[in-house]
UniProtKB/Swiss-Prot annotation:
Classification of source organism: Eukaryota, Metazoa, Chordata, Craniata, Vertebrata
UniProt: CoA binding residues: 103-104, 208, 214
Gene of this entry: NAT1
Species this chain originates from: Homo sapiens
GO cellular component: a single term: cytosol
Protein name as catalogued: Arylamine N-acetyltransferase 1
Biological role stated in the UniProt entry: Participates in the detoxification of a plethora of hydrazine and arylamine drugs. Catalyzes the N- or O-acetylation of various arylamine and heterocyclic amine substrates and is able to bioactivate several known carcinogens.
Effect of residue 64 to W: In allele NAT1*17; a slow acetylator; has defective enzyme activity
Main location: cytoplasm
Binding site for substrate: 106-107
Chemical reaction(s) catalysed: an arylamine + acetyl-CoA = an N-acetylarylamine + CoA
Amino acid sequence: MDIEAYLERIGYKKSRNKLDLETLTDILQHQIRAVPFENLNIHCGDAMDLGLEAIFDQVVRRNRGGWCLQVNHLLYWALTTIGFETTMLGGYVYSTPAKKYSTGMIHLLLQVTIDGRNYIVDAGFGRSYQMWQPLELISGKDQPQVPCVFRLTEENGFWYLDQIRREQYIPNEEFLHSDLLEDSKYRKIYSFTLKPRTIEDFESMNTYLQTSPSSVFTSKSFCSLQTPDGVHCLVGFTLTHRRFNYKDNTDLIEFKTLSEEEIEKVLKNIFNISLQRKLVPKHGDRFFTI
């Protein structure tokens, strides 16, 4: 595996001599705009592999994306290779319908320490929940970013990531009540502890998430990619583009239903993905918002 090939894949051309917050932010932003958050392997009949060599091959050599366990594993390797002090952490994702956090540790995120300060770095949540900058590990502080205002809160050794969202405008009235729309203005995202993890800690959950009928990842095919002003999402046959804060503290969300023939073109033109096997788009009933 070659760090230069990774940096070329994400389009990062600047110096990486300084292990500072600016460099870390730049690498994160390049990755989230180049590497989609996606689970298309499952819906092409392939496995979502946790091995670093397999992830490198998929993302760097074959120009694909992956889900959190893959893209954040790759980012962990890249940041560590560059010289950042990086730790894997495990997260518990909030379920809006159940009104509780997952019992299983289903999310991989990173902690990076720079000059004695700790930051949360996550390139693998996608959609309008994706951080664009590292979050300083401070409890109760609002941290405004382009997508929203993020807030970390600590209680009894558990940390909670929440977001304060804008209003949203959907010009196509056909989609005003889409099940993909987020209703909450204040949204809980996930919880985590600062206990260091290894990729082996996620192996059983990686299998469960891609095989269980109750998993959102088997229920829906999706692909999400950040842009300089928003985010593209493809869920099943539904394509959306969200423009953050297009006016008056409001996000603009445009919807389009694609035909099967259009999906291949959209994957290539918007997400820069060419699949080797046939995708079977799926929009099941598990809760998933953009």
